[in-house]
């Protein structure tokens, strides 16, 4: 589980689209005929400590398993998430949100994200204000019934409050210290609606 508080921003260093499946402790992670990409991500030094193979980490809100580490580079093998999330659209040089899963006893309060993405949505509008940035996001039609004002939603791994809803669009407000500078109109984001996962 994750708190929805991004701990750092990584950079995609390499994408191997012809990757072979890897194993941890002799156990295959994926079926041998699975479509697979390996993503190498440069981690910030302050969150790299203690990262080991087998650890669960959220990348843009998607729960992935570390398969290899080499200095500042952490590798993930990605299978189903290529089609179900935005990870299949990443390019070398892209920025990604990173959060380690919390350990037993670390969680305070009832908020959490599972790292299982509910759908992919589109950023349709940015509104710059004095103390925050307002973002309007267009959700897939089949998820609109689960959108509720003043409830929480995960957007690329960031736990945020839905401030307003218009049809299948919803609005979130970002504090200035929330670093999402590389997002723009037209960007696609992973969303997780905790209500569907039973987290509300």
From Swiss-Prot:
Its main location: cytoplasm. Lumazine-binding repeats lie at residues 1-111, 112-200. Keywords: Cytoplasm, Luminescence, Repeat. One of its GO terms (biological process) is bioluminescence. InterPro entries: ATP_synth_asu-like_sf, Lumazine-bd, Lumazine-bd_dom, Riboflavin_synthase-like_b-brl. It is found in: Cytoplasm. Transmembrane segments: none annotated. The keyword Cytoplasm applies. It comes from the Bacteria. GO terms for molecular function: riboflavin synthase activity. The keyword Nucleus does not apply. Gene3D superfamilies: 2.40.30.20. GO terms for cellular component: cytoplasm. Disulfide bonds: none annotated. Monomer. Blue fluorescence protein (BFP) that can bind 6,7-dimethyl-8-ribityllumazine, riboflavin, and 6-methyl-7-oxo-8-ribityllumazine as a bound fluorophore. Has no riboflavin-synthase activity. This is Blue fluorescence protein. The gene is Y1-BFP.
């Amino acid at each position: 589980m994750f708190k929805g508080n991004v701990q750092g921003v990584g950079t995609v260093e390499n994408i191997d689209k012809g990757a072979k499946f890897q194993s941890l402790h002799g156990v295959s992670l994926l079926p041998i005929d699975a479509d697979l990409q390996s993503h190498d991500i440069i981690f910030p030094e302050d969150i790299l400590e203690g990262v080991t193979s087998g650890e669960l980490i959220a990348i843009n809100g998607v729960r992935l398993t570390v398969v290899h580490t080499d200095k500042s580079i952490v590798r993930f093998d990605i299978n189903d998430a290529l089609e179900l999330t935005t990870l299949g659209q990443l390019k070398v040089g892209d920025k990604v949100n990173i959060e380690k899963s919390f350990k037993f006893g670390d969680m305070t309060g009832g908020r959490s994200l599972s790292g299982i993405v509910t759908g992919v949505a589109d950023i349709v509008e940015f509104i710059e204000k004095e103390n925050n940035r307002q973002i309007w996001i267009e959700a897939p039609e089949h998820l609109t019934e689960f959108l509720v004002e003043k409830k929480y939603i995960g957007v690329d791994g960031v736990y945020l409050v839905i401030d307003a809803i218009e049809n299948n669009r919803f609005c979130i407000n970002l504090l200035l210290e929330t670093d999402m500078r590389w997002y723009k109109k037209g960007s696609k984001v992973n969303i997780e609606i905790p209500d569907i996962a039973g987290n509300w």
